[in-house]
């Protein structure tokens, strides 16, 4: 009887040790793309514009100034063509911070976003600079520019 209980206990311990790992927090190298960082918000903004069905996700991470601009173009294609002047069929988005400091403690940040993608079979590479403001605990996209 004692052997059966010992066997069941060992079996239960082994089964519980083989459970799923908890999901990783953040993304990128060393979790740099955690949701509290401006790089994460900048990538999320463009990801909603290029990989989502609508612009609602991009509007959620925008300041009121950017929200008005995005809403005036109604669709992802309109925003891509008129606001960003970059259309892609497929695109990869990579951030690069303009400061060496810790942006998550700042009130504003400037992030360079690099795009590499396809449009009608041609490969294009481009870059945009994004200015973000910290509103409460969240980063919001305020402006997108070429410079």
Label the model's feature ranges.
Residues 44-52, 61-69, 135-138:
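Structured segments of extracytoplasmic/periplasmic soluble domains
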Residues 1-16:
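Sec-dependent bacterial lipoprotein signal peptides
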Residues 99-147:
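Exposed beta-sheet edge and beta->alpha loop/turn motif
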Residues 14-17, 53, 97:
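N-terminal regions of proteins, emphasizing targeting and processing segments when present
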Residues 55-106:
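Short solvent-exposed beta->alpha transition segments
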